[in-house]
Amino acid sequence: MKALSKLKAEVGIWMTDVPAPELGHNDLLIKIRKTAICGTDMHIYNWDEWAQKTIPVPMVVGHEYVGEVVAVGQEVRGFAVGDRVSGEGHITCGHCRNCRAGRTHLCRNTIGVGVNRPGSFAEYLVIPAFNAFKLPDNIPDELAAIFDPFGNAVHTALSFDLVGEDVLITGAGPIGIMAAAVCRHVGARHVVITDVNEYRLELARKMGATRAVNVSKEKLADVMSALGMTEGFDVGLEMSGVPSAFQDMIDKMNHGGKIAMLGIPPSTMAIDWNKVIFKGLFIKGIYGREMFETWYKMASLIQSGLDLTPIITHHFHIDDFQQGFEAMGSGKSGKVILSWDK
């Protein structure tokens, strides 16, 4: 079958011909319809330090997808050939303390689809049936293909009560932008998102951000004043991994504020812990999606009218994958969809 693989320990990704995956007793075989390029895929493409330490070569990559079930393992219940599915990209062990307690998103033995095992940039994918999510008919393929990153946004944004709250989001990548849309949809008062990329700040405006602030040109304190804010933000969503952005967030949080962190900062990042302590801030780390509460919430948000379509800015056939990666790497894109349909 055709598949995009990391074949060499260098920059790039290659179209290859690999054997189709084998179906296990508890697995689904999925024929891929559409995939999306993730920031993780860009790390793998660019072969940065994280990728060099993490990705075995060769490896079929990709983990954002939608497809159709074409075969079902003999022990599987609840799925049938013809079902349209997306899937959770974190394969969990099922026997650690967190898995047994129903907190599978915190499994210490997680294996990543397209990272530690063959991924979805292929004609066919095998995953455990436990990881598949059957899609409602009224959610189109292109939205289903981005459920993985949308789930990151939903998990982060819905970590805290948002109704009537003032929210600061640092980092206007696709996940940060989708988080802004979620915050507005569920009833936040002001949703302010910061970045230095004008293209993506404009996308954030289209997706409902109250203010999209280029912090290289405008002071966040001035924006807060213009919005009539006098006490700081109630909720912070850190999506950038940029130390200066996180420090700015801590400075602008109200006393008792709550921060959810999805962005990955340098391990040596220093912050003013005095402000964390004396403001009584709550900081929560976010990894992946809650299984499967986040997935149910994603479907419900879209079915209740949340419009994610502006975040999808580019479509390519899989044969033109190189153009897709170039678009994603340009900084002038939202989500990039690769279609596997003939």
Swiss-Prot record:
Instruction: Report the SMART domains cross-referenced here.
Output: PKS_ER
Which reaction does this enzyme catalyse, per its entry? L-threonine + NAD(+) = (2S)-2-amino-3-oxobutanoate + NADH + H(+)
Q: Give the GO biological process terms.
A: L-threonine catabolic process to glycine
Q: Where does Zn(2+) 2 bind?
A: C93, C96, C99, C107
**Required cofactor(s):** Zn(2+)
The EC number(s) attached to this protein equal 1.1.1.103
Q: Which superkingdom heads the taxonomic lineage of this protein's source? A: Bacteria
- The active site annotation covers T40, H43
SUPFAM superfamilies per the UniProt record, alphabetical: GroES-like, NAD(P)-binding Rossmann-fold domains
The entry's free-text remark on the cofactor is: Binds 2 Zn(2+) ions per subunit.
Which residues of the sequence carry a binding annotation for NAD(+)? I175, D195, R200, L262, G263, I264, I286, Y287
**Pfam families attached to this UniProt entry:** ADH_N, ADH_zinc_N
| Residues in the signal sequence | none
Q: In which pathway does it act?
A: Amino-acid degradation; L-threonine degradation via oxydo-reductase pathway; glycine from L-threonine: step 1/2
Q: Give UniProt keywords alphabetically.
A: Cytoplasm, Metal-binding, NAD, Oxidoreductase, Zinc
Q: What does this protein do?
A: Catalyzes the NAD(+)-dependent oxidation of L-threonine to 2-amino-3-ketobutyrate.
Q: How does it assemble?
A: Homotetramer.
What family is this protein classified in? Belongs to the zinc-containing alcohol dehydrogenase family.
- Stated name of the protein: L-threonine 3-dehydrogenase
